[in-house]
Amino acid sequence: MIKTIAFDLWGCLLKENDYPMSEQEEILEKQFWNLNDDEEYFAWATKTLSLSEEQIKAILTPIWEKLYSLREQSIFEKILKKYPNIDFAIATNHISDVKNSLKHLWISERCKTILISWDCGYEKPSKEFYELLIKRIWHNAEEILFIDDQEENIQNAENFGLKAIYYQKNTILSETILSYLSKIE
């Protein structure tokens, strides 16, 4: 029985909106995926833009608030209507400051566990990332449904005993999840 659904953020739970970014925002956003941790990111950003870390964070906040939104506004409610005892978690590779996005979208209030690679020091698809996810959720691996849009992440999650769904963007996420859950009941 699934007790927790762990979502990847980008490409699964969140979608990217058409938001015209400033030159500074574009520079900062493009590097989200190219560096390994907060220290490296902010060292690069402060050097590149000649701004303080606080100024960089002030530029990032509008990016979280305008560029990203929930792929499906009522996804949590739809799942909880059918499975009221399920918990939610986030498992993402990203800069720690992404927490601002989660607050803006009320995701942090809905998710019991939030695991961000740059916070914990491990990235998907590493063994350590999945071990830490399981440890923080406090359920057995087979009680966790992991959803991601990267096949390698899905494969490794399954290798560590998690149930997993490879999410494809042309489908409705809640329907994909509910269909999967109904099949394994």
How should each PLM-predicted stretch be described?
Residues K66-Q73, H94-D97, T171:
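Short beta->alpha connector loops
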Residues T46-L60, C111-I114:
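Short, basic/glycine-rich phosphate-binding loops at helix/coil junctions
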Residues M1-L51, N159-F160:
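Active-site neighborhood of HAD-like aspartate-dependent phosphohydrolases
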Residues K78-Y83, I95-V98, K112:
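Short basic alpha-helical hairpin corresponding to helix-turn-helix/winged-helix-like nucleic-acid-binding
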